[in-house]
Amino acid sequence: TDVPFADIIEEFLRAEVGGFSFEAASPRHAHEWRVWQDHALPEGTVIYPGVVSHSTNAVEHPRLVADRIIQFAEVVGPENVIASTDCGLGGRLHPQIAWAKLQSLVEGADIATRELF
């Protein structure tokens, strides 16, 4: 039921919005950061890639989160990346796991920020 990001990127890019939020951490979508290598981000637009997944109880290590952020930043520019989550965490995960994932996101973003800026 999930479509490949490459199949819908053109529609994405036609939207007149300030940013794009999309899954990028789940096993189904983790490889799709490469789509941005072949498509320019519209001027003045940012991306909100999911760098922690709602599809597993495993808490991502901050280094993995940082690596995911850096992958996107190297393609679209660090000023155009705002780290996010894959969908909402509350409906599928225990609250303690959701908070741990958010803490990992913060720590990973700090690492990526130090390395990129």
What positions do the PLM features span?
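Domain-level signal for soluble alpha/beta catalytic cores
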Residues: T1-F117
